Design a protein with these regions (language model features):
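Catalytic domains that recognize anionic headgroups
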Residues: 1-507
Length: 507
């Protein structure tokens, strides 16, 4: 089957939140079982160096929906009234659009990330949607302290260690209240999202019209509550563990608070949850195949970011996104694309950013070069003329080897980084001196609050004192800072980073 844009009618975009790239078999992990995603990778194009330019959850969605960088402009904030989204462009073009999701940050008051979709189906109860179940009485048999480690909560005198302790128990209590009626594996959040997706594909959509479907699963984001936790069984990836299942841990550095054995168990639960997500995504892919849609549908599967979970390469000493640190385990993401007529089984090593995904979708739909205008009915229409991404189609078709020489990543107002074939460089912005040196974007009026960069009270704005340089070939997970030994290379990359950020500020 040769590539022909006119034969591609539909797009299915699947976002899996907090899925670390190297926890997938197709990205080299030999422990985690992900057969469905691995099969999809073999039949699709896999991108080995995809990076989220501005993290975490919300700025990634904004970049993907608008085709424009969020770094360095803004962070955790609503869609702007002047943002042109994919659905804005598709409006009036005889293409039905649907959003099926449980990612509650997209649904925060006035955030507007469901804007423009014809059909919206939200599954309540995930993180930041606690109010849905706040009046639900908790089964007395379910105690929050039974789903974490006591030494993370209380000191030797039986007192709370700090303010993180009651917050952790409250957070676990919220999740228990939401999931206490869970009886089967179909009651998990990812199952609900994928089952509702199947229902829309089979029963609700207009089968005479093309469609754009955005599926957004918050799983495998924490809580780490895979099937074994609810069944009261050992985790298959850690059957010898004898403590409480650790559904959640505090937003803290792990040293002195979370043991390495506990970190191992957390990672095992995370792996099990990924395997569960893989199974349900597999069912959605099977549904697409069974309905004969795969030969006329572009399918994208990716994540917004990974997850720090321990020391060294597992998280640089932190748990969850408790610090604004743009290291490899967080900003390097999995990305796979199936495009009918494009050779499957390819692995592309060129750098890719979120905005390139959006540009590719528009290119496949033959809308990348469209401009704002007026329809035949006198209504304003929108185009992709302001996109900052590059289509990946030329690489996938073998016309070019790469579209970028580097990638950028970071947290709004706190950290920037640049990644090249040989090096990665991290520049910290928090101190006033560093802000001045880097000509940092202030933009206080363009973000909800710097304290809300994860929208979690436990997160702290703490960064290292010095910029960092890493040899990607010898040290891919950025454990040995060589900036002092290589000041010229560090300065070269800093200047390159400042130039890139400066160019983004003016476009």
């Amino acid at each position: 089957m040769s590539f022909d844009k006119s034969k591609i009618k539909n797009v299915v975009f699947i976002m899996l939140d907090t899925l670390q790239f190297n926890y997938l078999g197709c990205y080299g992990n030999e422990t985690v079982k992900t057969p469905h995603l691995d099969r999809f990778a073999r039949q699709s194009v896999l991108f080995e160096n995809a990076y989220s330019e501005g993290v975490p959850t919300v700025p990634v969605r904004r970049a993907l929906m608008t085709g424009r960088f969020t770094l360095p402009y803004g962070g955790w904030q609503p869609l702007g009234s002047d943002d042109t989204t994919i659905t804005d462009i598709l409006w009036g073009r005889n293409m039905q659009t649907a959003l099926i999701y449980d990612t509650a940050p997209m649904r925060l008051a006035k955030f507007g990330y469901s804007r423009g979709f014809d059909y919206v189906d939200f599954c309540p109860g995930q993180e930041l949607d606690h109010t849905t179940f706040e009046n639900e009485p908790l089964d007395p048999a379910l105690k929050p302290e039974d789903f974490t480690s006591a030494t993370m909560v209380w000191d030797e005198n039986g007192e709370y260690i700090d303010d993180e302790s009651p917050q952790l128990l409250d957070e676990i209590g919220c999740f228990l209240r939401q999931q206490q009626h869970r009886r089967t594996e179909a009651d998990s959040y990812v199952a609900k999202v994928m089952n509702r997706t199947d229902s829309w594909l089979r029963e609700r959509r207009d089968k005479n019209r093309p469609f754009f479907l955005w599926i957004d699963s918050f799983d495998p984001h924490e809580p780490w509550d895979p099937p074994s936790v609810w069944k009261g069984e050992p985790c298959p990836y850690d059957p010898e563990y004898e403590g409480n299942p650790i559904m959640l841990a505090p937003w803290v550095p792990v040293e002195g608070r979370i043991t390495e054995r506990e970190c191992e168990h957390i990672r095992a639960l995370y792996m099990e949850k990924i395997t569960d997500v893989d199974r349900w995504v597999g069912r959605t892919l099977d549904s697409i195949r069974e309905q004969g849609l795969m030969d006329e549908t572009m399918v994208v599967i990716m994540s917004d970011h990974g997850q720090p979970m321990g020391e060294a390469e597992h998280g640089h000493g932190i748990m969850r996104k408790s610090r604004p640190w743009p290291y490899e385990e967080l900003v390097h993401v999995p990305l796979m694309m199936h495009i009918p007529g494009v050779e499957g089984g390819q692995r592309i090593s060129s750098f890719v950013q979120n905005v390139d995904v959006t540009a590719t979708i528009m290119d496949v739909l033959d809308l990348l070069d469209t401009e704002d205008g007026i329809s035949d009915h006198g209504m304003k229409t929108f185009g992709a003329e302001d996109y900052q991404g590059e289509s990946l189609l030329p690489m996938m078709q073998g016309e070019v080897d790469k579209i970028r020489d580097y990638a950028i990543a970071g947290y709004y107002g706190m950290s920037w980084s640049i990644i090249t074939d040989e090096y990665s460089y991290v520049h910290w912005l928090v101190s006033e001196d560093e802000k001045n040196n880097a000509d940092c974007v202030e933009g206080a009026d363009k973000v909800m609050s710097e304290d809300m960069w994860t929208c979690t009270a436990g997160a702290k704005i703490e960064v290292p004192q010095h910029n960092e340089l890493y040899d990607r070939r010898k040290d891919p997970f950025q454990l040995n800072n060589i900036a002092e030994e290589n000041p010229e290379k560090a300065e070269e990359l800093l200047q390159k980073l400042k130039l890139v950020i400066g160019e983004l500020r003016t476009t």
